[in-house]
Design a protein with these regions (language model features):
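Hydrophobic membrane-insertion alpha-helices, especially the h-region
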Residues: 11-28
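Glycine-rich phosphate-binding loop signature in dinucleotide/nucleotide-binding domains
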Residues: 142-146, 237, 329-330
């Protein structure tokens, strides 16, 4: 009797193991993120494991090769005069086929020839306005020949605590992540070769995430710190700085496109103007295109249209809007 139970248990264990291996193998072609290396003193808070292949199929579909620096860029040599592109996962464009994000489109327009890179993408997941400000001087030092810097943001409504964090800017340290510990290497291997585990973990975290707290009145302290932050980054770079501002969209019951409230946007816009920083507000462009063609610049997230990342249309519209302003900087 005991032997029979052991046999049944082993059969189930083998079946589960085989099933896991099959599904894990299928995930290799559906959703395979790669190792994530933190760079607290780098041009961005983190980057991907250099030289790996990232597969992202849970929203759109993209197969992306990570470059030698851990970012999403085509193979090629960076030109002496180039555009440095900072931002979040929207700018990365890992949901798209290769060559369809706006930095690749800028490169196609400005590059001197095949094998040259005129635009370089250092965006990373979760790299929003506070961390963009924090890592700005490190980015300038890491890429001293940048003729222009674009910074993609989707929200300016940030707290005093986030702004205080941002103003404690990172001091650039080159090659700070050359040596990874054993635990970090093990985590990276699990993430890259067991994508099913990573997918399950991601879904559980999404399900457990809490709804955002209700909005409070705009803090005058936060407004003052935001103005200080923009004045600071202006002092750290003499070239063209362009903030690309966009907001994820929704569709109202009457079919019109709507955006969430951003209470600090007016303060941010005035601070950009006061410091000679260009602000490219993509909302009117997106609304005009939607009204003409009924097509959104964002994908789906959790079945809600317009709540996902920038899609091919969104990236193309951003590239088209940027090019006239970058022509002079790249001349």
């Amino acid at each position: 009797m005991v032997a029979k139970k052991i046999k049944v248990f082993l059969q189930w264990a083998v079946a589960l193991a085989v099933g896991f291996c099959i599904v894990n193998l299928l995930c290799m072609g559906y959703e395979r993120l790669v190792g994530w290396i933190e760079t607290p003193n780098g041009p961005s808070p983190a980057h991907w494991n250099p030289g790996t292949i990232l597969v992202h199929g849970t929203e759109g579909y993209g197969i992306t090769k990570i470059d030698q620096n851990g970012y999403i860029n085509p193979d090629g040599t960076l030109e002496d005069s180039h555009i440095l592109c900072m931002g979040s996962s929207h700018t990365q464009g890992k949901e798209l086929p290769s060559g369809k994000n706006y930095t690749a489109l800028l490169n196609t327009h400005f590059a001197a020839g095949e094998g040259s890179l005129a635009a370089y993408n250092i965006a990373c997941d979760g790299n929003f306005l506070p961390s963009l400000i924090k890592h700005f001087p490190a980015a300038v030092e890491a890429f001293p020949n940048a003729s222009a810097i674009t910074i993609e943001i989707s929200n300016t409504d940030i707290s005093v605590e986030e702004l205080e964090y941002a103003l404690e800017q990172a001091e650039y340290v080159q090659d700070q992540t050359a040596q990874l510990g054993l635990v970090s290497k093990l985590k990276m291997l699990i993430k890259e070769y067991f994508p099913l585990l990573n997918l399950i973990k991601s879904k559980l975290e999404t399900a457990a995430s809490a709804a955002p707290a209700g909005a409070e009145a705009v803090s005058q302290h936060a407004a003052a710190l935001l103005r200080e932050a923009l004045e600071l980054i202006r002092s750290q770079y003499d070239g063209e700085i362009i903030f690309i501002y966009h907001q994820q969209t929704g569709i109202a019951q009457d079919g019109t496109i709507v955006f969430d409230e951003d209470r600090l946007f007016d303060v941010f816009a005035q601070a950009c103007q006061d410091n000679g920083i260009r602000l490219l507000d993509m909302r009117p462009v997106f609304v005009e295109y939607y009204n003409l063609h009924q097509e959104l610049p964002y994908g789906f997230a959790n079945t809600r249209p317009g709540n996902g990342h920038l899609n091919k249309l969104g990236h193309r519209l951003i590239a088209e809007a940027l090019i006239p302003y970058l022509e002079e900087a790249m001349a």
